[in-house]
From Swiss-Prot:
The lineage of its organism: Bacteria, Pseudomonadati, Spirochaetota, Spirochaetia, Leptospirales. It comes from Leptospira borgpetersenii serovar Hardjo-bovis (strain JB197). The gene is xseA. Its main location: cytoplasm. This is Exodeoxyribonuclease 7 large subunit. HAMAP family: Exonuc_7_L. It is an enzyme of class 3 (hydrolase). Heterooligomer composed of large and small subunits.
Length: 422
């Protein structure tokens, strides 16, 4: 074994190719999966990867085969089944499926999940244009959330420095793909939002990549971090697809990191020109204000108050004195009128008191008279009342009969009597 001649890479590759091409299990087979990394060359050939939950396989759909395809346009995320033969590309040492037919099975699970999340966030108002902030025209400090080793960071810094050399740049490094990317991007954005850094605008993103490479920017946590950023944020992910949810949540989105830097950072000459124009406008406005103030001063200086200020003051003092005298008279008149009314009221009260006293005396007099003439009072003076058995008052002897029993009412009580004689 140790003395056997070592094989070259090409020899090993040819052996593998013979094994693959000689296997009936890899010829004219149907393979089902989800399209990713889709691209179409100028030659008309279509290249894409077919994947499932754990594996990825490269596919080539040559123009002489795909010209017969009449289904919906192929794109990343679509679930399809393809018919073809597995081959091995010797120069690259990788296997490939040469596709003869493609049948679309429906939209891929990933795109469906993204669409559901998009609808959910849209219903919450995350993508509403009204909540987007204006990107500052003249930022002092630019914050960048991206990979520290990618081409994106170099492009952003290069463009920013070339446009405005004096701008402050603060980098918050993060992963931009893989399982750790979502939490890392969120942490980077939150760090740049800390008030102590004084960041005016944030660029968050990465350079181009495959559909899978960009999936972190469709993660719900990342999208919400874009939307919740206290500082205006620019999405800067290099892509040609329209399904990146972070683009919708950002205050402004650009197709590349370079474009984001150009939008966020003004040119120094433009800033100087703006300041020069602003200085001119301020100077013009100030001169106009001074001229207007001079005209007003000239107009006011010709008025009476400035010519004879003491005379005007004397007139005002005289007017105050006149008003004081009138006010004093009015007060005195009011007091005098109130005094007269009070005297009239007191006189009326005295008269009413006298009338009441006389009326009371008269009432007491007649009350005494009435009481003196009442039957009980009369009987106290020696009088009596005579009644027959039926209770009728007897006023003369003719109203009684001999031997008739009668009742006598006296002051102290009653007694029974019998008439005697005729």
């Amino acid at each position: 074994m140790e003395d056997s001649k070592p094989l070259t890479v090409s020899e090993v590759t040819r052996i593998l190719k013979n094994l693959i091409t000689g296997s009936k299990d890899l010829k004219n087979i149907w393979v089902r999966g989800e399209i990713s990394n889709y691209s179409k060359a100028s030659s008309g050939h279509i290249y894409f990867s077919l994947k499932d939950s754990s594996s990825l396989m490269r596919c080539t759909f040559f123009n002489y085969s795909n010209k017969n395809y009449s289904g919906k346009p192929l794109s990343d995320g679509k679930e399809v089944q393809v018919y073809g033969t597995v081959t091995l590309y010797e120069a690259g040492g990788s296997y490939n499926l040469n596709v003869a037919r493609v049948e679309e099975l429906g939209q891929g699970d990933i795109l469906l999940q993204i669409e559901k999340l998009k609808q959910k966030l849209a219903a919450e108002g995350i993508f509403d244009p009204e909540r987007k902030r204006r990107i500052p025209s003249f930022p002092k400090t630019l914050g960048i959330a991206t990979s520290p080793s990618g081409a994106a960071i170099e492009d952003i810094i290069k463009i920013a420095r070339s446009r405005f050399p004096g701008i402050n740049i603060l980098i918050s490094p993060c992963f931009v793909q893989g399982d750790e990317a979502p939490d890392s991007i969120v942490a980077a954005i939150e760090e740049l939002n800390h008030p102590s850094w004084g960041v005016d605008v944030i660029i968050a993103g990465r350079g181009g990549g495959s559909f899978e490479d960009l999936m972190a920017f469709n993660d719900e946590k990342v999208v919400r971090a874009y939307a919740n950023s206290r500082i205006p944020i620019i999405s800067a992910v290099g892509h040609q697809t329209d399904v990146l949810l972070s683009d919708f949540a950002a205050d402004y989105s650009t197709p590349t990191p370079t474009a984001a830097a150009e939008y966020a950072v003004p040119k120094e000459e433009d800033v100087l020109q703006f300041l020069t124009q602003l200085e001119g406008r301020l100077k013009t406005s100030l001169l106009a204000k001074i001229s207007s103030s001079k005209d007003r001063l000239r107009l006011l200086s010709g008025k009476f108050i400035f010519k004879e200020p003491m005379q005007l003051l004397n007139q005002r003092n005289q007017r105050v004195d006149e008003i004081g005298v009138r006010l004093q008279k009015a007060v005195f008149n009011k007091v005098g009128l109130a005094r007269v009314r009070l005297e009239r009221y007191e006189d009326l009260t005295s008269r009413m008191r006298n009338i009441f006293f006389h009326k009371k005396q008269k009432a007491e007099f007649w009350t005494t008279k009435v009481e003196d003439l009442s039957p009980p009072a009369t009987m106290k003076r020696g009088y009596s009342i005579l009644r027959n058995q039926k209770g009728k008052i007897i006023r003369s002897p003719e109203e009684t009969k001999p031997e008739e029993e009668l009742q006598v009412l006296l002051s102290g009580g009653t007694m029974q009597v019998i008439r005697k004689g005729k």
